[in-house]
């Protein structure tokens, strides 16, 4: 598999100027920068067989700027192979854009790792057919394509079994800010789940704002035209020189650092800083060990010591506290909340609702909720699941939430046949002793009598569609569960 994650693509295009020596100079410059920043990087070439690519009547047409540019920088197959070897020798991935079918064959012959589809070729179906049969990972730009055209391309590559990534791109050279439309990156990510999305840029080489926004929007591949200027070579106004490339990557790395993790990370320094501003709980009068502490017994003041009960903790809904020691008047209280069933259930419900909101699973208010806890509510996070009952007639539909690390014990049904449809996350379902690894979008049929258990490492939400559900139709293979009253291992809620 290709490593598309945080891949920087240095597009050489024709900036080699028809010189292998200068092309290698560009490769070495990019290799040094990639090594400096320890990044996943590639150099991209362009292959065209100009003897057939350009119509014979136009080979001497000086008005067609692209034709004269291609002819003046032409390299033969052997010269391109030298560049490919130099790319690999510098620890970089070789990528190439073919503009005709013969060039696809040459890419395979040169053992280039990734094929890149140019925006202008993204609807060239004869070329796309050839590329899809090359057996190489593909990255495609989408400049100038409508969403429907991108849908067609993604569908084609998917059905061809091609490993691929999609790059947002604007085919204007250079691209002004107002044309970039980087919001579209988010739409591509939502529209094609599981597909790596990136950005191929042609903006001013000194414009570092664009890479920052692209990464913030979710791009994971970044492409720019690069070159090395000399006394006789001047780069075009959308190609980066090595100094600009260095600045570009530094900006990308800083952006990644600023973005951090998608999970909330509270550092010790942040917690300490906030604690210094909180109010602590202090005894208004002497309090004896074993007393239930009421609001009349305490007052709030700062500073609050490390581990001391805060005003927010004391005033939380249904929070109760019992003195674990004797307290003198004005002494700070160090206690933990007496957690009741309400607090445990609320935590479970809030976690499940958050998982569903993040997954985009929207439910109505007309439903019931079951907490299935086979060994008690205290062990819910280890064993069980949360079930949302939507309808139960001749057909039945439920939404089932499996928490990270949670296991649902093995059972089978005699009357009910069911189908699991994974909506979010991943699930390992064990069917009659065999593991099935399921991801988002997968469907699993469980027939009557099939023993099944499931678990999830990262958490999972799936839809269960079945025949009518009967409460006495779940048969557990663990005797300690089978002997329980079915309602003893359930907590029923009217709604979220």
Question: What is each of the regions a protein language model found here?
Answer:
Residues 381-384, 396-414:
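Conserved short histidine dyad/triad with adjacent acidic residue
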Residues 1-347:
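Catalytic cores and adjacent flexible loops of soluble metabolic enzymes
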Residues 403-404, 414-432:
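Glycine- and acidic-residue-biased ligand/ion/polar-headgroup-sensing regions
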Residues 341-396, 481-496:
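A short, N-terminal "cap"/entry segment at the start of jelly-roll beta-barrel domains
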Residues 457-496:
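Double-stranded beta-helix
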Residues 6, 65-67, 374, 379, ...:
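Structural/interface elements that position substrates and couple domains in central-metabolism enzymes
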Residues 433-451:
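Short acidic-glycine-tyrosine-enriched beta hairpin
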């Amino acid at each position: 598999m290709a490593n598309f994650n945080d891949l920087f693509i240095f597009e050489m295009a024709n900036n080699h100027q028809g010189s292998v020596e200068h092309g290698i100079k560009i490769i070495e410059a990019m290799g040094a920068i990639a090594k400096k920043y320890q990044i996943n990087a590639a150099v991209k070439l362009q292959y065209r067989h100009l003897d057939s690519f350009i119509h014979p009547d136009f080979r001497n047409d000086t008005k067609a700027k692209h034709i004269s540019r291609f002819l003046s920088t032409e390299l033969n197959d052997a010269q391109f192979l030298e560049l490919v070897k130099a790319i690999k020798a510098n620890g970089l991935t070789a990528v190439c854009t073919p503009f005709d079918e013969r060039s696809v064959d040459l890419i395979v012959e040169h053992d280039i790792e990734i094929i890149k589809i140019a925006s202008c070729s993204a609807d060239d179906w004869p070329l796309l057919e050839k590329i899809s049969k090359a057996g190489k990972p593909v990255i495609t730009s989408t400049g100038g394509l409508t969403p429907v055209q991108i849908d067609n391309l993604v569908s084609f590559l998917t059905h061809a079994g091609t490993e691929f990534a999609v790059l947002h791109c604007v085919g204007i050279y250079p691209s002004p800010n107002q044309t970039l439309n980087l919001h579209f990156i988010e739409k591509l990510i939502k529209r094609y789940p599981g597909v790596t999305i990136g950005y191929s840029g042609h903006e001013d080489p000194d414009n570092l704002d664009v890479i920052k926004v692209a990464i913030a929007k979710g791009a994971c591949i970044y492409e720019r035209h690069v070159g090395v200027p000399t006394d006789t070579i001047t780069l075009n106004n959308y190609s980066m020189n090595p100094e600009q490339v260095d600045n570009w990557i530094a900006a990308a790395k800083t952006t990644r650092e600023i973005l951090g993790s998608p999970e909330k990370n509270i550092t010790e320094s942040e917690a300490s800083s906030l604690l210094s501003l909180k109010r602590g709980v202090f005894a208004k009068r002497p309090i004896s060990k074993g007393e239930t502490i009421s609001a009349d017994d305490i007052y709030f003041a700062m500073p609050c010591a490390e581990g001391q009960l805060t005003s927010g903790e004391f005033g939380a809904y249904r929070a109760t506290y019992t003195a674990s020691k004797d307290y003198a008047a004005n002494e700070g209280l160090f206690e933990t909340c007496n957690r009741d069933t309400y607090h445990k259930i609320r935590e479970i419900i809030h976690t499940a609702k958050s998982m569903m909101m993040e997954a985009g699973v929207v439910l109505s208010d007309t439903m019931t909720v079951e907490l299935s806890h086979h060994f008690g509510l205290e062990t819910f996070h280890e064993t069980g699941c949360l079930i949302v009952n939507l309808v139960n007639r001749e057909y039945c539909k439920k939404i089932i939430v499996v928490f990270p690390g949670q296991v649902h014990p093995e059972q089978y049904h005699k009357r009910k046949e069911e189908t699991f449809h994974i909506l979010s996350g991943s699930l390992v379902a064990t069917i009659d002793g065999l593991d099935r690894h399921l991801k988002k979008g997968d469907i699993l049929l469980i027939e009557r009598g099939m023993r099944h258990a499931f678990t999830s490492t990262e958490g999972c939400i799936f839809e269960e569609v079945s025949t009518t559900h009967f409460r006495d139709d779940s048969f557990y293979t663990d005797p300690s569960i089978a002997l329980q009253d079915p309602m003893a291992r359930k907590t029923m809620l009217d709604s979220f």
